[in-house]
Swiss-Prot record:
One of its GO terms (molecular function) is damaged DNA binding. ATP binds at G67, P68, E69, S70, S71, G72, K73, T74. Can catalyze the hydrolysis of ATP in the presence of single-stranded DNA, the ATP-dependent uptake of single-stranded DNA by duplex DNA, and the ATP-dependent hybridization of homologous single-stranded DNAs. It interacts with LexA causing its activation and leading to its autocatalytic cleavage. SMART domains: AAA. It comes from Citrobacter koseri (strain ATCC BAA-895 / CDC 4225-83 / SGSC4696). Residues 345-354 have a biased composition (Basic and acidic residues). It is found in: Cytoplasm. Gene3D superfamilies: P-loop containing nucleotide triphosphate hydrolases. One of its GO terms (biological process) is DNA recombination. Residues 331-354 are annotated as: Disordered. Belongs to the RecA family. This is Protein RecA.
Length: 354
């Protein structure tokens, strides 16, 4: 629909005044001088990258990963950091729980010598550090472990047993308003790890909720629910966990998709095992009886041997990964965000701090 000449002149004058006052680029047409594709970082799990619809976690956004204890939350974020570092990106880990194990992080592929780490005393300090790193424009990925450990200063300085209703929720709400714009401007990915709490007196529906109030639920572009659904065994020994991740909220693609993968103790996500499964599913890898073949060449008898072969031949593994991504991501279009709060419940505004 055409705009008449007087309106065009008035609009041009208004845009010129806005840019003069607030700087160039402060207002523009949505499709002007910018890529519509979202830049992403791999999660370290091929099936989860595909479930997210964009090939990974989106840069310049807030992401929340929550689940029960020992479900793989920290492992998943360390895999994201390792993937980002392999691309030459700078990463920071805000260890509010004071529980980061550098030896374990190194086993997962994290370059701990170049990983920025902070163990803040208060929640406010942790969030100010996040904001300072984002505003610097020099940090690409920030992980906060965890929201539940972001204790307000007033609570730390008070007595155990004092009531501090809503303090953490208010602190998170203020931080989200401040951080969202800075993260977008600097194209920094901020990942919050969160814990689960139970609502008291819930008779129907899911009683689970996350800590820190509701602000994070609104501001997060992606919310991932991670659960341990079984054990990985070698004979009688448990060597890992079968893990399921549900994309509860997704603003960059269709939500509610799921991914299942293995987390092996001391190794992290079993990426090459996923590659074998997805390769067979997409008919890139042939399976005849117990034998697996690629391009007519046998790569192993049994999944374990095929996985080991791919690990020893990274060039072939990369080739298969590229083909899988092209097949499974090319037809996924972005859709509006129809996702709601945890497990299908609508979000109710509250000042309660769980």
């Amino acid at each position: 629909m055409a705009i008449d000449e007087n309106k065009q002149k008035a609009l041009a004058a208004a845009l010129g005044q806005i840019e003069k006052q607030f700087g160039k680029g402060s207002i523009m047409r949505l499709g002007e001088d910018r890529s519509m594709d979202v830049e992403t970082i791999s999660t370290g799990s091929l099936s989860l990258d595909i479930a997210l619809g964009a090939g990974g976690l989106p840069m310049g956004r807030i992401v929340e990963i929550y689940g029960p204890e020992s479900s793989g939350k920290t492992t998943l974020t360390l895999q994201v950091i390792a993937a980002a570092q392999r691309e030459g990106k700078t990463c920071a880990f805000i260890d509010a729980e004071h529980a980061l194990d550098p030896i374990y992080a190194r086993k997962l592929g994290v370059d701990i010598d170049n990983l920025l780490c902070s163990q803040p005393d208060t929640g406010e300090q942790a969030l100010e550090i996040c904001d300072a790193l984002a505003r610097s424009g020099a940090v690409d990925v920030i992980v906060v472990d965890s929201v539940a450990a972001l204790t307000p200063k007033a609570e730390i300085e008070g007595e155990i047993g004092d009531s501090h209703m809503g303090l953490a929720a208010r602190m998170m709400s203020q931080a989200m308003r401040k951080l969202a714009g800075n993260l977008k401007q600097s194209n920094t990915l901020l990942i919050f790890i969160n814990q689960i709490r139970m609502k008291i007196g819930v008779m129907f529906g899911n009683p689970e909720t996350t800590t820190g109030g509701n602000a994070l639920k609104f501001y997060a572009s992606v919310r991932l629910d991670i659960r341990r659904i079984g054990a990985v065994k070698e004979g009688e020994n448990v060597v890992g966990s079968e893990t399921r991740v549900k994309v509860v909220k997704n603003k960059i693609a269709a939500p509610f998709k799921q991914a299942e993968f293995q987390i092996l103790y001391g190794e992290g996500i079993n990426f090459y095992g996923e590659l074998v499964d997805l390769g067979v599913k997409e008919k890139l890898i042939e399976k005849a009886g117990a034998w697996y073949s690629y391009n007519g060449e046998k790569i192993g008898q049994g999944k374990a041997n095929a996985t080991a072969w791919l690990k020893e031949n990274p060039a072939t593994a990369k080739e298969i990964e590229k083909k899988v991504r092209e097949l499974l991501l090319s037809n996924q279009d972005s859709t509006p965000d129809f996702s709601v709060d945890d497990n299908g419940e609508g979000v109710k505004e509250t000042n309660e701090d769980f």
